[in-house]
Amino acid sequence: MNKEIIYDREMNIQRCYSTEYQGMKVKYIDHMGSDLSVVNSAYASFGKMEHEYNPDKHDRLIQYLSRGMSEADFEKLADNLAYKTTNAKDVAKALWQFRNTPTHYSPFTHTCITLQCTVPIAIHAQLVKHTVGFNINTVSRRYVSTTPELFIPEFRSKPTGNIKQGSGDVHEQAHYWQVWYKRQAEASIRTYVDMVDAGIAPEQARFVLPQGVMTEFVWTGNVASFARMFNQRTDSHSQKEIQDLAHMVGEIIEPLYPVSWNALTGN
């Protein structure tokens, strides 16, 4: 993964400005708020406001907001599960209770991050399923007729067993299929260009483009919504390309809200 690191004078930290991996790109555009914003949003219930971040006090508050329980209660639960609870039903009950413990996510939503992303159309189609707390504006080929870039995937085998989704290791003939894919996809792109040059409307010509062409979009959300996406898309059951993209997003967001990001993602 290629990363562009900048020094942020306002935050007095070095942070990731953009990431690129296998043709996919994520770039920082803007953000609002900090871990202190999360703290003050929580304190609003008591009519209070802090002017400086106090790690000794505020780290614990943010962890409590994300878990729905104090650090002491969390450690007690972990200790019981690890050393004291042996009955399978008791373990299942404790895990169910932890999973369904009411959390306090609203303070995290008083933040805002805007990113610019370049991904294959097939990956974009998965990302737009994340709707809660997000807004997306995508380059439209109704209006843009530039020659699209092509994503070259790593072709992997079907998963073993009865699993219907996902993929396994790199296919033994991956290089052959990459060559075939590139030849067919580039032919489709040339056809698209020829159709536009011949006077076909871009919104009609785009139907010949394959799922592997790149698209660009502006993506805005809060730290809680991005963390939810990160947790779901870094799971081993997700497609590898979207796992990679989620990690790229995390590289940019984590330095902006380090305590909140850790509390929400465990990173």
Residues of each region from the PLM?
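Family-specific signature for flavin-dependent thymidylate synthase
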Residues: 1-267
